[in-house]
Design a protein with these regions (language model features):
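Mature catalytic core of soluble alpha/beta enzymes
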Residues: 1-180
């Protein structure tokens, strides 16, 4: 992802507090200080051991639901069972729906109870990341939860959401976050 998905953004995530009762636009000096601890250069892997430089922390929120969905899908597959797993923006279609593909709707960011598209899938995951569910507004500016590890601010682009279809929900999570 060339750093676009960076699990070391935990200090920034905590600083912004988006989705919590403490959400705020942090002071630039606080963002600058947090950025000193962000980046995979602060992660050192040796065999089964992972060490972080001082102040660095890991936030697996960008892939945790995908990991959980994959584990649940494996349980269903091992039991030779069909089912639809829905974990927020992570949907895993295991097998078929009475012999037919599962029809998965992609939510409309402007009207989340409506859909903008539908895909027919089986044994695949459909993962959507977007800036339209976890955000706050301050002084007329909208701040969402997907943070840019280079700037320390929410990603700025013209996208409201990205959906990825693949055989791994964890991979879909990482890719959809990266593409945002």
């Amino acid at each position: 992802t060339n750093g676009a998905y960076d699990p070391t953004v935990a200090p920034l995530t905590d600083l912004w507090g988006i989705g919590t009762e403490h959400q705020q636009v942090p002071a630039q000096s606080d963002i600058d200080a947090a950025l000193q601890t962000v980046g995979t250069q602060h992660v050192h892997v040796s065999g089964d051991s992972v060490q972080l430089d001082g102040g660095s922390r890991i936030d697996l929120g960008g892939i945790a639901k995908g990991y959980a969905a994959d584990l649940c899908a494996d349980i269903l597959k091992d039991a030779d069972a069909d089912g639809l797993l829905v974990l927020g923006g992570n949907i895993y279609a295991v097998g078929t729906n009475e012999g037919k593909d599962w029809n998965i709707g992609i939510a409309d960011p402007d009207e989340p109870t409506d859909t903008v598209a539908a895909v027919a899938v089986h044994d695949l995951s459909v993962v959507t990341s977007g800036d339209y569910e976890r955000y706050f507004e301050q002084d007329g500016v909208r701040y969402h939860h997907i943070l840019d590890p280079d700037t320390g601010y929410p990603i700025q682009n013209d996208l409201w959401g990205v959906s990825i279809i693949c055989d791994s929900s964890l991979t879909g999570d990482a890719l959809s976050t990266t593409c945002m």
